[in-house]
Amino acid sequence: MARVKTGVVRRRRHKKVLKLARGFYSARHKHFRKAKEQLERSLVYAFRDRRAKKRDFRRLWIIRINAACRLNDISYSRFMNGLKKANIALDRKVLANLAMNDAAAFAAIVAEAKKAL
């Protein structure tokens, strides 16, 4: 059987990696080996941060809800307890959106939560 050299296959593989490494700094988007190393690392960061993003947004929503609650003279934890007792099933994303964009509606929800306590 004849020996097969990797010319075309290697070029395709290198082009694929270098295409994914566009925008990287210096040799990390020009040299295959450096690009491959950086690409592997960047995919690890992407995997990690897709999970961290969920935590970060939840923290942001809680901060916003807490700030709006304190304007309505109630703490975040008492507000969430009141919502649970009043059987109001709104998630933190929706509550934070209401707190930011519709203060009157949020105040009405706070009043219901206070009543349930």
Curated annotation (Swiss-Prot):
Family: Belongs to the bacterial ribosomal protein bL20 family.
GO biological process: ribosomal large subunit assembly; translation
UniProt-listed InterPro entries: Ribosomal_bL20 (IPR005813), RIBOSOMAL_L20_CS (IPR049946), Ribosomal_protein_bL20_C (IPR035566)
Gene3D superfamilies reported in the protein's UniProt record: 6.10.160.10, Ribosomal protein L20
Organism of this sequence: Campylobacter fetus subsp. fetus (strain 82-40)
SUPFAM superfamilies named in the record: Ribosomal protein L20
The keyword RNA-binding appears for this protein: yes
Function: Binds directly to 23S ribosomal RNA and is necessary for the in vitro assembly process of the 50S ribosomal subunit. It is not involved in the protein synthesizing functions of that subunit.
Taxonomic lineage from the root: Bacteria, Pseudomonadati, Campylobacterota, Epsilonproteobacteria, Campylobacterales
Keyword check for RNA-binding: yes
Protein name stated in the entry: Large ribosomal subunit protein bL20
A Pfam family per the record: Ribosomal_L20
Gene that encodes it: rplT
One GO cellular component, as annotated: ribonucleoprotein complex
GO molecular function: rRNA binding; structural constituent of ribosome
UniProtKB keywords: Ribonucleoprotein, Ribosomal protein, RNA-binding, rRNA-binding
S-S bonds: none
